[in-house]
Amino acid sequence: MTEQLQHLNLRNFMGFNNLTLDFSPKINVLIGENGTGKTHLLKAAYGLCAGAPLFKNKPGTSDDELEAALTAKLLRLFMPLDDKLGKMHRHSATDQAYLSARFAGGQKIAATFFNNSKALAVQDRANYEQYQAETVFIPTKEVLSFMKGFNSLYEKYGLSFDQTYQDICLLLDLPEVRPETLHEKSKWAMAEIEGICGGRFVFYGGGKVTFKTENAEYSANSMAEGFRKAGILSRLLETGAIQPGVSGPLFWDEPESNLNPKLMKLLVQILLELSRNGQQIILATHDYVLLKWFDLLMDKGKDRKSTRLNSS
């Protein structure tokens, strides 16, 4: 699939001296202790995929416009000190910072900056305008409990949330796609989540979210955090933001947090099924139990060959 991320290289960026990663088209798990840079790695890869909506809206985007868009994206994702790009340059490094990503369709984006730079300098954008598959980033904290009014507040005020939270709220507020256009595995996953939660989350627009059972309706805030987290995945499938074989990579930071054992097992089953049907998934975790569920539930032949573990 041309939407998949194949290769990432980070040099003198944040805490990375020279990091090179090759990605599986299916499941990728980044493993490491707190503070090893897992979230930074996810955000860097996600940020380099940010050209997709830009080129969709303006196919003839110039280098200057692309540099401005990517710079703004990185600043909002990483929120460096004083909102300065140069603060993301690796401390004490003498060479420029370098970020590059290569995709399965041959598209590439590479950019550099120094510790005094105000904007990224694009060095290579080979066929990058052809990469138009939008990606999804699910942050560690669930967002259903504070979605109402969040997007307008985020645009108006300097909230202490990085842009992954605004991005996910915007995707969750999209209307659902027609049922007949949903992937069969998406329908299956949504039904499984509804079954284990005992109901479903309903999105009314404007960030208003409730939880409905057969006989009653409740505030989303009254539901367990693990259920809200599962509800986010279900909604992303319902809106088509995650569409196996069509959408770009799914980045998920610590998907296991606040999940009970039954929910964690179901989550792994769903992620494996989505990956088998063309969805690239890139996770970050330090949880042994999550890794064990992948080990127990994956197909020992096919899944093992296409699942990649990277420790940081």
Predicted regions and their residues:
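Switch/communication elements of ASCE P-loop NTPase nucleotide-binding domains
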Residues: 1-54, 210-308
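Phosphate-coordinating catalytic segments in nucleotide- and nucleic-acid-processing enzymes
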Residues: 2-9, 49-246, 308
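Serine residues within intrinsically disordered or low-complexity segments
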Residues: 311-312
